[in-house]
Amino acid sequence: MARVKRGNVARKRRNKILRLARGFRGGNGTLFRTANQRVMKALCNAYRDRRRRKRDFRRLWIARINAAARLNGLSYSKFMGGLKKADIRINRKMLAQLAVIDPKTFTNVAVNSKS
């Protein structure tokens, strides 16, 4: 059986991991074995949190809309139900921005959803 010479393959693989680990503290950024563990964990966290971010922002928007709706005498569910009945199609992100940036406009939307 012929001898297999790997050349630069192993070094390239290790350097790729160390490049990804740049900026990590201590040996986590310089030693291959610990850097490899940290990089794998970091990539797992990034994958998980890309999905979690969508949930977190939706919760934040709902909390903001609820607070602004209660200032106008409505609960969140009544407010959203009123928007559906009035056929006002504004998504939660835009409603939350209105509540924070332009409360007068949000009040107008709330009045329309009441009627």
From Swiss-Prot:
<keyword id="KW-0689">Ribosomal protein</keyword>
<dbReference type="InterPro" id="IPR049946">
    <property type="entry name" value="RIBOSOMAL_L20_CS"/>
</dbReference>
<dbReference type="Pfam" id="PF00453">
    <property type="entry name" value="Ribosomal_L20"/>
</dbReference>
<dbReference type="GO" id="GO:0019843">
    <property type="term" value="F:rRNA binding"/>
</dbReference>
<dbReference type="GO" id="GO:1990904">
    <property type="term" value="C:ribonucleoprotein complex"/>
</dbReference>
<dbReference type="GO" id="GO:0003735">
    <property type="term" value="F:structural constituent of ribosome"/>
</dbReference>
<keyword id="KW-0687">Ribonucleoprotein</keyword>
<comment type="similarity">
    <text>Belongs to the bacterial ribosomal protein bL20 family.</text>
</comment>
<protein>
    <recommendedName>
        <fullName>Large ribosomal subunit protein bL20</fullName>
    </recommendedName>
</protein>
<dbReference type="InterPro" id="IPR035566">
    <property type="entry name" value="Ribosomal_protein_bL20_C"/>
</dbReference>
<keyword id="KW-0699">rRNA-binding</keyword>
<comment type="function">
    <text>Binds directly to 23S ribosomal RNA and is necessary for the in vitro assembly process of the 50S ribosomal subunit. It is not involved in the protein synthesizing functions of that subunit.</text>
</comment>
<dbReference type="GO" id="GO:0006412">
    <property type="term" value="P:translation"/>
</dbReference>
<dbReference type="GO" id="GO:0005840">
    <property type="term" value="C:ribosome"/>
</dbReference>
<dbReference type="GO" id="GO:0000027">
    <property type="term" value="P:ribosomal large subunit assembly"/>
</dbReference>
<dbReference type="InterPro" id="IPR005813">
    <property type="entry name" value="Ribosomal_bL20"/>
</dbReference>
<keyword id="KW-0694">RNA-binding</keyword>
